[in-house]
């Protein structure tokens, strides 16, 4: 799950990580009130969307007067903003964050993530903040420091100090960085996060470190035990179809093709998309209906797939292990009738009671195209969209 900047900063503050004072606003007048409550300025007005790169898109403004605050907020709120990090999607700006604007002397980069290669929580730090870390890694990799944390010992204060010395910080800042890193480690573990990014982690004119911008991602599989994080979810920033899928316990990801996929099991779903690609087609989605492919779940799955007008055919690829193929076939038939599917439907069944399932499909009176195996089904799906 993604979070807004203001939500990330709320969590930072709870764990003692220094952040500029700030308030959110949903209107230009509220933004002015927020600015006045923070002092005499200057201020930063920042659009709150689930994407980075807001500055280049006009979503971050430096304001010296409350009139400028009002103008900046009015220009952002109620609009949709696309950035180079939003994957071509324009996201709605429903809130702005108004913060104090400190005088920056140096920008650093600091992140915490799970490194699958080393199977550890890993810190990435750089003396080059305020820019994409990927660019730094490509152009000046010597400016990046990494630290893999031993999961038994945990992060030790000396490790944070060592990173600080390598970044060229002064003694006071080295100690501040060590404390920030320890706080981030605790936050990361307490909340089951998958990413924390401070970019920039800035040195202000008084010599202190502050997290001027922050990004947090949490592990969706752990959300059930963090109701306080679940309450922060902003569905307006998400794909509507994916939101509906999650509400029905379906794993759905929108893609760019025209062949809808309905599969039980994530591994089989990925294999199905691969075989479609190998046969010259393009999948329109990833959709795992799970082990219990009931009529209700299959019906919802068809509705999700057909919510995209790009879909020209649907490939249903089901392996009946625990669930019998005849029960799955009944669910498919009922769902096709209820939804009123107008595009070709190719069905491949395999597993328990497969013959009974195929017989039900064959005698259903519906224009369902049977497939013998995954490759046959993919070929027929590709043929259906290229007619």
Curated annotation (Swiss-Prot):
Binding positions for substrate per the UniProt entry: 264, 321-323
Gene name in the database record: sucC
One annotated GO biological process: succinyl-CoA metabolic process
Pathway: Carbohydrate metabolism; tricarboxylic acid cycle; succinate from succinyl-CoA (ligase route): step 1/1
Family membership noted in the UniProt record: Belongs to the succinate/malate CoA ligase beta subunit family.
InterPro entries, per database record: ATP-grasp (IPR011761), ATP-grasp_succ-CoA_synth-type (IPR013650), ATP_grasp_subdomain_1 (IPR013815), Succ-CoA_synthase_bsu_CS (IPR017866), SUCC_ACL_C (IPR005811), Succ_CoA_ligase-like_bsu (IPR005809), Succinyl-CoA_synth-like (IPR016102)
Catalyzed reactions: succinate + ATP + CoA = succinyl-CoA + ADP + phosphate; GTP + succinate + CoA = succinyl-CoA + GDP + phosphate
Pfam families: ATP-grasp_2 (PF08442), Ligase_CoA (PF00549)
Stretches of the chain forming a coiled coil according to its record: none
Co-factor note (free text): Binds 1 Mg(2+) ion per subunit.
Source organism: Xylella fastidiosa (strain 9a5c)
UniProt lineage: Bacteria, Pseudomonadati, Pseudomonadota, Gammaproteobacteria, Lysobacterales
Molecular function in Gene Ontology: ATP binding; magnesium ion binding; succinate-CoA ligase (ADP-forming) activity; succinate-CoA ligase (GDP-forming) activity
Keywords in alphabetical order: ATP-binding, Ligase, Magnesium, Metal-binding, Nucleotide-binding, Tricarboxylic acid cycle
Name of the featured protein: Succinate--CoA ligase [ADP-forming] subunit beta
Name of the top EC class for this enzyme: ligase
